Swiss-Prot record:
Keywords: Cytoplasm, Disulfide bond, DNA-binding, Nucleus, Oxidation, Transcription, Transcription regulation
Motif residue range(s): Nuclear export signal: 660-667
Intervals of motif Bipartite nuclear localization signal: 34-41, 67-74
Comment on protein domains: Contains two cysteine rich domains (CRD), referred to as the N- and C-terminal CRD's, n-CRD and c-CRD, respectively. A nuclear export signal is embedded in the c-CRD, with which the nuclear export proteins interact only in the absence of disulfide bonds (or otherwise oxidized cysteines) within the c-CRD or between the c-CRD and the n-CRD.
SMART domains for the chain: BRLZ (SM00338)
Biased composition annotated in UniProt, kind: Low complexity: 127-138, 231-244, 335-358, 542-573
Any Pfam family: bZIP_1
Protein name according to UniProt: AP-1-like transcription factor yap1
GO MF, one annotated term: DNA-binding transcription activator activity, RNA polymerase II-specific
Length: 700
C-alpha cells in the first residue's frame, strides 16, 4: 500500500523513530528521545540508531490528521515481544547497581503509565518510562516488581542491623563511661579517707612533739640527778639508771654523810640545786648505805613542771667543771636562811659532788670544825633572828616579781637600794659596824665571795637574784663609807653644813642625796647632764609647742645678762632661792626639777633653814617634779595659751625677741610658778615682768 507521505517526510520519520516502536506511541516520544541529565535514567535511553535504522516492512505510517489509521499487522506484537526480552535484559543489567528505592519508583511509574491518562508528560520521567512500559508488557513488570521487593528487604535488613549496631555501641560506651566514673569516685573517696587519716596522724604527732618540747624545756630548767655505779661492786640500786626525782619526806636533823666505803653511787653532771618553791627543808638522804645527793622536799604537792631551779639559769648557763680529785674532797652543806636549808655552792669552787674518801672519824672531825656549835643550834639561832642573806630568790620576793607594786612600801627602793644611808647609819657614822654574816658555811680557801655593800658576807651565786628588803643585811652598809662620801661631796661644793643638810632630810633619803648632787652640778639631772651644752639659738617652737625639757639644763654658755635677770627676779620676788651652785654666788636659780626652795632672802646658796622649811620645800619639789608644764593664768583665772601669750606681749615682731633666751625664760617662769591644785601656774603679771625685764636689759 502506497504511503500518503512524501518520500522526504517518510525518510525523516524513519530516521527519528525506532523500527520496533509501536505506532500508538505518545507524542512526547517524538521529542524526548534523548536522555536529560538529572531527569532521565539510563533505562530510558532509546535503542541504538543501528537497530532503528533497519527498515521495517510492516511499518505503519504515523498518525496524521489527514490520513487514516493504518492497519497493524498481526505479527507486530510478536516481534515486539520477541525483541523486548533482549531490551529488558539489557535494562536489568544496567539496573543491577541501582538502589531498591529507584526500582520501586520505576515500578510505580511503569504501573501508572498503563492507565488511560493523557497527563503522562507531567511525570518526572514520563516519555522514557512510558515507552519502556508499553514495550515490556505485563511479564516484565512482574519480574521487575519481584526483584525490587527482594532488594528492598535486603536494604531494610542492613539498615536495621546498622541501627542495632549503633544502639549496641552507644550502650557499651555508656557502660564504660559509668564504670570509669564509678572507679574515679571510688578513688576519690579512698584518697579522702587517707587524707583524713593522715591529718589525724599529723595532729597526734604535733601534740606529741609539743609535749616533748615542754618536757625538754622542763628538764633543762630543772636540776635532776642521774645515778650510776662508780665501781664494779653490785648494790641493790646499782642497776637503777633512771633519774632520781624529788620525793617528799619528813624533816630530819642534819647529820654528816656516811663514809665513802658505803657510798657506791655518784652524781654525774650535778648542777647547783635550789629548793622548791614552797619547800621548808632540803636534806641529805641518809636512809640507805648509798648517799645520793638529790633534791628532796617536804612539800606535799607534786613538783611543779617549771620549778624554781630556773633561777639557776637567771645569770646564764652554769658550767659544770670536772669532778675534783679524792685527795681534795669538796662538799656542799646546807646553809640556813629564813628557815630554809639549801644545798649551795657559795663556798665551793666545784659544782660536782664527789663522795668523801676519808674514813668516818676524819669526816666527823671536819664536820665539827665547820659546825662547832652543831647545825641545829645554828638553825634555831637564825630562825629566832629571822635574818637572811643579802640576796634571796625570786620566790621569796613575791612583790619583786611584779612592777605593779613598785611604789608601795618602798619595795623597789629596797630592791635597788642605791639611796642615801638610813638614820641609824647616819647617826652612828663615826662608829663603823660590821653586820653579822649570813648563816652560810665558809671555808678558808676555794670559795666564791661577792661583797656588794657588806663586809664578810659570802654571797650565794644561786641566790643572786634580788635583795631581801626585810633583812638588815639587804641594805648596803654605808657606815664605813658615809663620812668619806659626805666629806667628798662637801669638799666639792665648799659646804661645811653637809651633816646639817643630811639631818634635814632624815625622813627622805633621796632628797639628802639629791641635795648633795645639786650643790655640785647645779641641776636636777645626772652628772653627765652637766656636760650637755644646749644650743643658744632662738626657736619659738621651744616655747610655743614644747614644755621645758629636763634634759636641757643651764650651761656656762649663758650670758651675764641672763644671770643678772635671774638674780634680780629672785630678789624682787623674795622667793625661789635654792641651794644650787651657779656661775656667781650672788644669784639664785630655782628652776631645776630637784631644787629645794626656801623662804629666805639670803642670796648665799647654803642650807641653813629649819626642818619645817625643808618639809615644805620637799612638797614644793614633789609638785614641780610631777608637773613639767607651766600654765600661765590671767586675772580671771583662765589659762592662757602660749600663742595668745606670745601675741599679747608683742612677740610676733622680730625686734621684740632679740633679747630673749628661751631656756632662760622657761627657767625663770618655772622658778616663779606656784603649785596650785596639783598644777604649776604662773600669774600673767609675773610673766609680763619677766618679758619686759628682758626688754629693758639691753639699755642698762
Amino acid at each position: 500500500m502506497q504511503s500518503a507521505l512524501t518520500p522526504n517526510t517518510a525518510a525523516f520519520l524513519e530516521y527519528i523513530s525506532p523500527g520496533h516502536a509501536p505506532t500508538s506511541a505518545p507524542p512526547a516520544a517524538l521529542f524526548n528521545n534523548m536522555p536529560v541529565p538529572g531527569r532521565d535514567t539510563p533505562e530510558d535511553t532509546p535503542p541504538s540508531v543501528s537497530n532503528g535504522s533497519q527498515p521495517s516492512a510492516h511499518q505503519a505510517p504515523s498518525d496524521d490528521s489527514d490520513s487514516p489509521t493504518p492497519e497493524m499487522p498481526p505479527a507486530q506484537p510478536d516481534d515486539a515481544a520477541n525483541t523486548d526480552p533482549l531490551a529488558g535484559n539489557g535494562a536489568n543489567k544496567r539496573k543491577a547497581g541501582r538502589p531498591s528505592a529507584v526500582l520501586d519508583d520505576d515500578d510505580d511509574d511503569a504501573s501508572d503509565s498503563d492507565l488511560p491518562s493523557g497527563h503522562e508528560d507531567k511525570k518526572q520521567h514520563g516519555a522514557g518510562r512510558a515507552a519502556a512500559a508499553s514495550a515490556s508488557g505485563s511479564g516484565r513488570r512482574g519480574r521487575k516488581s519481584g526483584g525490587g521487593e527482594g532488594d528492598g528487604k535486603r536494604e531494610l535488613s542492613k539498615s536495621e542491623r546498622r541501627k542495632e549496631q549503633n544502639r549496641a555501641a552507644q550502650k557499651a560506651f555508656r557502660e564504660r563511661r559509668e564504670a570509669k566514673v564509678k572507679d574515679l569516685e571510688d578513688k576519690v573517696a579512698e584518697l579522702e579517707n587517707k587524707a583524713y587519716g593522715t591529718q589525724i596522724e599529723n595532729e597526734n604527732l604535733r601534740g606529741i612533739l609539743k609535749r616533748l618540747q615542754e618536757e625538754n624545756v622542763a628538764l633543762k630548767q630543772s636540776a635532776f640527778t642521774f645515778s650510776m655505779p662508780v665501781n664494779s661492786r653490785n648494790s641493790p640500786n646499782s642497776n637503777n639508771g633512771s633519774f632520781s626525782a624529788p620525793a617528799p619526806q619528813n624533816r630530819k636533823p642534819l647529820t654528816p654523810p656516811q663514809s665513802s666505803n658505803d657510798d657506791s653511787l655518784k652524781a654525774v653532771d650535778d648542777i647547783p640545786m635550789l629548793p622548791h618553791r614552797h619547800s621548808s627543808a632540803n636534806t641529805i638522804s641518809d636512809n640507805s648505805s648509798e648517799s645520793l645527793v638529790s633534791l628532796r622536799s617536804t612539800d606535799r604537792t607534786p613538783p611543779a613542771l617549771f620549778s624554781d631551779h630556773f633561777n639557776t639559769y637567771a645569770l646564764g648557763v652554769v658550767p659544770v667543771p670536772p669532778p675534783s680529785s679524792s685527795s681534795q674532797p669538796t662538799q656542799k652543806y646546807p646553809s640556813a636562811s629564813n628557815g630554809q636549808q639549801s644545798i649551795s655552792s657559795n663556798s665551793n669552787s666545784s659544782n660536782v659532788i664527789s663522795p668523801p674518801s676519808a674514813d668516818q672519824s676524819e669526816f666527823n672531825a671536819l664536820w665539827e670544825s665547820l659546825y662547832p656549835n652543831d647545825v641545829e643550834n645554828l638553825v634555831s639561832q637564825n630562825a629566832s633572828q629571822n635574818q637572811g642573806g643579802p640576796f634571796t630568790l625570786l620566790n621569796s620576793q613575791p612583790d619583786s616579781m611584779s612592777f605593779a607594786s613598785a611604789g608601795n612600801n618602798n619595795s623597789m627602793n629596797a630592791l635597788f637600794n642605791f639611796g642615801a644611808p638610813s638614820s641609824p647609819s647616819i647617826s652612828n657614822s663615826a662608829q663603823p659596824s660590821v653586820n653579822p654574816a649570813p648563816a652560810s658555811v665558809t671555808q678558808p680557801a676555794n670559795h666564791i665571795t661577792q661583797n656588794l655593800g657588806a663586809t664578810g658576807q659570802a654571797s650565794d651565786w644561786n641566790r643572786f637574784a634580788f635583795r631581801e628588803p626585810t633583812a638588815e643585811a639587804s641594805a648596803p652598809n654605808w657606815d664605813l663609807t658615809d663620812n668619806s662620801v659626805n666629806e667628798f661631796l662637801a669638799s666639792l661644793s665648799g659646804d661645811t653644813t653637809a651633816d646639817a643638810t643630811a639631818n634635814d632630810y632624815l625622813n627622805n633619803d633621796d632628797e639628802a642625796f639629791n641635795a648633795q648632787l645639786r650643790k655640785i652640778f647645779g641641776n636636777d639631772n645626772s652628772p653627765s647632764a652637766a656636760f650637755n651644752l644646749p644650743s643658744t639659738s632662738f626657736s619659738p617652737n621651744n616655747y610655743l609647742n614644747m614644755s621645758p625639757s629636763p634634759m636641757m639644763p643651764l650651761s656656762n654658755s649663758q650670758s651675764p645678762q641672763s644671770s643678772d635677770s635671774r638674780s634680780n627676779t629672785n630678789v624682787s620676788s623674795g622667793r625661789g632661792n635654792d641651794i644650787s651652785m651657779a656661775d656667781s654666788p650672788e644669784y639664785s636659780m630655782g628652776s631645776s626639777r630637784t631644787s629645794v626652795s626656801h623662804d629666805s632672802t639670803d642670796l648665799q646658796g647654803k642650807a641653813t633653814t629649819t626642818t619645817t622649811t625643808a618639809i615644805r620645800s620637799a612638797k614644793n619639789y614633789s609638785c614641780k617634779s610631777d608637773n613639767e608644764v607651766i600654765h600661765v593664768v590671767d586675772e580671771k583665772g583662765r589659762v592662757i595659751k602660749p600663742s595668745e601669750l606670745w601675741m599679747r606681749f608683742g612677740m610676733q615682731h622680730e625686734n621684740s625677741t632679740e633679747h630673749l633666751l628661751i631656756d632662760d625664760l622657761c627657767d625663770q617662769m618655772r622658778a616663779k610658778a606656784t603649785c596650785k591644785d596639783g598644777k604649776m601656774q604662773l600669774d600673767i603679771t609675773d610673766a609680763a615682768v619677766l618679758f619686759r625685764r628682758g626688754e629693758r636689759r639691753p639699755s642698762q
